[in-house]
């Protein structure tokens, strides 16, 4: 942690996450609690934790996660995880809100029709849908014009009907992989990272 802080040339970070729910999660969490207590981290959180893993983490530690960064997009809406997080004071944050364009997201007729109705892009419709669900979104872009477009979602509101149409797109399936698949867990935990 100190090496990362030095490379960033900072005295503290605003948010620090455990990226996957594997390994010595409780040991890592307690170390993060100590860093938060020391003022090196303002908020601590997790990524890719299902409610059962969060319940375990909360039960055996002093500080509950401030954030849980999970895959949320129109095809994987996390209809159980999002309200569970919110009811426990954990802010859901959507990674891959556009599912990296998989499943034809940017051409989907429901999303394009809603976008046309408001004069907005599919990306803006998706980000607004996430916003209206009380979820923070983490939308990656390297293009300046796309970044500006992604910010411009506060001048319209999706109707209840729009929200229901998007809700109907849910397949409850990751566009990437299952964090509960034993083969994937073995692969992830077997990787050696040079940090």
Across the structure, where does each feature detected by a protein language model lie?
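CE4/NodB-like, metal-dependent polysaccharide N-deacetylase domain
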Residues: 1-17, 34-38
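Beta/alpha (TIM)-barrel catalytic core signal, keyed to glycine-rich beta->alpha loops juxtaposed to Asp/Glu
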Residues: 20-195
């Amino acid at each position: 942690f100190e090496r990362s802080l030095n490379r960033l040339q900072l005295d503290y970070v605003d948010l620090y996450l455990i990226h996957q729910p594997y390994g010595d999660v409780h040991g890592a969490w307690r170390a993060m609690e100590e860093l938060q207590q020391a003022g090196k981290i303002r908020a601590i959180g997790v990524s890719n934790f299902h409610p059962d893993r969060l319940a375990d983490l909360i039960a055996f530690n002093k500080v509950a996660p401030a954030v849980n960064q999970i895959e949320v997009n129109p095809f994987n809406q996390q209809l159980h995880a999002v309200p569970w997080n919110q009811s426990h004071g954990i802010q859901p944050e959507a990674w891959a809100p556009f599912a990296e364009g998989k499943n034809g997201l940017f051409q989907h007729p429901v999303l394009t029709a809603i976008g046309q109705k408001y004069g907005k892009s599919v990306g803006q419709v998706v980000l607004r849908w996430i916003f209206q669900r009380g979820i923070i979104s983490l939308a990656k872009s390297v293009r300046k014009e796309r970044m500006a477009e992604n910010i411009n979602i506060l001048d319209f509101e999706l109707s209840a009907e729009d929200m229901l149409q998007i809700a109907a797109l849910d397949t409850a399936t990751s566009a990437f992989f299952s964090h509960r698949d034993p083969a994937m867990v073995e692969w992830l935990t077997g990787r050696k990272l040079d940090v």
